[in-house]
């Protein structure tokens, strides 16, 4: 599983529609993620930030994540901008530190 944090900014039209309708975007997001084996872990609005929303989700692989991004962001039309960050569990980072000694590398020199 991969864990992703996605921050996104709605278009002005989408923000207006959400506030006027009271639409539950969290449920809409779940409907895209869950059929692909993913899980919405958290969803937050962000006040005073460039981005309007932030969500943390898990996916079986990057393929399913990219499919959701393509459908919801590139094809959806309601998102003006976004930033994706892959979250790495600290256990994975610790495991990587144990492998470092096995890697051959020579840094460039002047």
Task: Please place each PLM-identified region on the residue numbering.
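Short S/T/G/P-rich N-terminal loop/turn motif that feeds into the first structured element of a domain
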Residues: 1-35, 39-51, 62-67, 88-110
């Amino acid at each position: 599983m991969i864990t992703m944090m996605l921050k996104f900014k709605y278009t002005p039209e989408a923000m207006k529609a959400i506030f006027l309708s009271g639409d539950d975007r969290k449920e809409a997001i779940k409907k895209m993620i869950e059929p692909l084996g993913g899980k919405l872990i958290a969803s937050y609005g962000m006040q005073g930030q460039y981005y309007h929303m932030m969500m943390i989700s898990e996916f079986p692989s990057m393929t399913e994540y990219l499919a959701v991004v393509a459908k919801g962001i590139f094809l959806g039309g309601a998102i003006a901008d976004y930033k994706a960050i892959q979250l790495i569990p600290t256990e994975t980072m610790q495991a990587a530190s144990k492998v470092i000694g096995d890697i051959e590398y020579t840094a460039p020199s002047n």
